[in-house]
């Protein structure tokens, strides 16, 4: 993984990703503010706005459930300052013998050292919704 900054928020994002993949809700609760908002856009399941750790794990858990865990992600770039961070990610998901190869963009708003708001935008091409059917 490459990063353009060594800001402490980069480590927070890397820790959040590891906790999300392992399903560690306790770690996520320490990383997210109590009222964290998670906004999901693009051809993904559970598109919309979700609240807190439970909302986040519901969305991410659904992706892992529908793919039987066949999720490979690589952070290509993470950049951060004291309030904002961005991430560019390459993801390859497998489901029912099909692959969805996409790039995702994330924007994070921090309050102190915790994530208060997060946007996930999947840039998969039009028609990719069929992957989830």
How would you label these PLM feature ranges?
Residues 1-9, 44-54, 104-106:
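Charged, low-complexity, helix/coiled-coil-prone segments
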Residues 1-30, 34:
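Short, low-complexity N-terminal intrinsically disordered segments enriched in polar/charged residues
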Residues 2-4, 57, 61-133:
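A beta-strand edge to alpha-helix "cap/lid" segment located at domain peripheries
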Residues 10, 38-39, 99:
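Short hydrophobic/aromatic segments of transmembrane alpha-helices and their interfaces
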Residues 11-20, 43-46, 61-65, 88, ...:
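Short, mixed-charge, low-aromatic patches
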Residues 22, 51, 96:
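Short glycine-rich loop/turn motifs that provide flexible caps or phosphate-binding loops at active sites
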Residues 25, 29, 33-82:
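A solvent-exposed, acidic/Ser-Thr-rich amphipathic alpha-helical stretch
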């Amino acid at each position: 993984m490459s990063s353009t900054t060594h800001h402490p928020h980069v480590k927070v994002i890397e820790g959040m990703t590891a906790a999300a993949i392992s399903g560690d809700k306790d770690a996520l609760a320490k990383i997210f503010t109590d009222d964290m908002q998670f906004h999901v856009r693009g051809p993904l399941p559970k598109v919309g706005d979700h609240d807190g750790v439970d909302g986040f794990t519901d969305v991410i858990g659904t992706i892992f459930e529908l793919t039987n865990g066949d999720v490979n992600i690589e952070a290509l770039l993470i950049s951060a300052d004291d309030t904002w961070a961005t991430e560019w990610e390459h993801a390859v998901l497998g489901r029912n013998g099909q692959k969805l190869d996409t790039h995702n963009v994330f924007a994070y708003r921090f309050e102190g050292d915790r994530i208060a708001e997060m946007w996930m935008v999947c840039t998969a091409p039009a028609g990719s919704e069929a992957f989830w059917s």
